[in-house]
Each structure stands twice: as C-alpha cells, then as structure tokens.
Amino acid sequence: HRTDRIRPTSVSLRTDSAATRAEAVSGDLSLTFSTPQSADSLIAALTRSARTLAGQIDTQSVDMEQLKPALPDFALRVSAGPDNILNSLLKSRKIAFDKLNAEGMSCDSLPVSVRLRTEGLTYGNVVLDTVTADIRQNGKRLEYVLGLANAPGNLDNIARAGLYGHLVRNTGQVNLYQRNRAGREGFRFGLDVTWTDSLIRASVTPSDPLFGFEPWTVNPGNYLIYRFDKRVEADLDMTHGDQRFAIRTPPGGGASGDIRLDIAGLNIGPALGLFPSAPPVDGVLGANLALNL
C-alpha cells in the first residue's frame, strides 16, 4: 500500500484577444505556457498542426518546413525538483530525478526547439548525473542530440555518451559515441536509415567505427533491409584483425529469407564492461549459421 501527500497546488489561465497564458505550480514543480494568440486561435492552430503532423505520419515523411507554419507561436517552461507529483509518479516505476528543466518554443523568427536537462536521474540502482536533450528544426530537418555526463566516481566507463542525428523526408541518421573517464572512446558508430511503405534499410557508418574500444572496418555499400512482409536482406561485413561479424544474403539470393551469420573470434568482454550492472563475463564468441527468416 502506498500513500502520497497532497502538495500545495495552484493553476491559473488568462486569455484575451491578444494572448493566452497558463501557469501551474505543485510542490516544487512550475509550468508556464504562453502564446500571442487568443484561446480560440490557439485551439484552431493546434487542430491545424495535428492535421499536418498526422499527414506526415501517414506519408512517413518528415518535413519541418511544412510543419512549422502550422504550429502556434508559443513558449513553454517547466522546472521541477524532487518534491512534486511528477517525481511521485516516476518513483512508482523506480525512476526519480533531483532536478529537471525543460523549455520549448516556436515563433516566426526562430525555429522550433525543445531542450531538456535532468540532474540526478536514477533508475533502480543506476544513477545518471546529467542527462540532456536538444531537439530543433534546421530547415526541413528535425535534428536531435541526447547527452549523458557522469561525475568522477560514477560510471567511469561512461563518463560521457551521446546519441545524435536527424530526420528529414523518409531518411534518418543515428550516431552514438561513448568515452570513459580517461577520454578514451569505447563506441563511435552510426546508422543511415531510409524507409518506404514496404521496407526499412540501414547502413553502418563510418567506414572505421569503434566497438568496445577497438577500431573496426566495415565493407563499403553495406546494408540491412527489413521488408514488412518479414523478409530480410543483408550485406554487412565488419572486421578487426582476426575478429569478424558478418551477416549476408547468400549469393544468388538463395531461398526467400535465407541469411548467413558468420561470427569469428569476437571478444565480448571489452564491450560488456561498458554497461552498468553487466555481469563479469569474458570470452571469445564464434558462430557460422544459416538462418531462414
């Protein structure tokens, strides 16, 4: 059985023909939303932007220059500490934070942007000192950056890490990096992704990625394709010295859905050691399999 006390809470809304402003305070959580539009104009703009967004989802095509004019001009700010209803809800799922700040805005002279920063984010026994997110418009693109930074003595193998990339039309890019306390890179690789109404295609980049602190080589023109009729096609061959990870469709195509997986001398210890709470496992992995998917 769990109970939670009711914190002092206030909510206010002011609107006229020129502007709308909403404020809410509960415990140490504060939210402010403002727009230079009346309530009726705001509702109409939200309906219009929802319709534009739904159209982009239907066509599976991201275009921020098309979405931006449909959005209302607005400014949103949220700040919170440990004593509020949001933290209480998260704690029921074993998540909590010490401090949170977020802001979002869109106006005629500036692109759409959303920023978020949390400090002391915990999940179970894992503590992340600082987590940041930055999502913004750059022309037609929607660009994103997620960052993680830990203080000395906490997760020193992941002193800094980040995920960044963009979405535009029917293409996307995902890049990952990680550095330990000494500044040594453990991971640095990315995926270029395209999609249609029948498939998703991904390619590993760059040609010299890092996995588990080790430099690898990736074959030019590599790809992984998943078709929505559940067929898989691939031509990916990554090597580092005597280590190899390859997944390929057999020459000539083979039977529909045939995939060959070739793993040789793969050292799993360095990569596993980067993850929090990973078991102390080491070894060399090898396999040569023919799969029918």
Question: What are the residue ranges of the model-derived segments?
Answer:
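Interface amphipathic segments
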Residues: 1-288
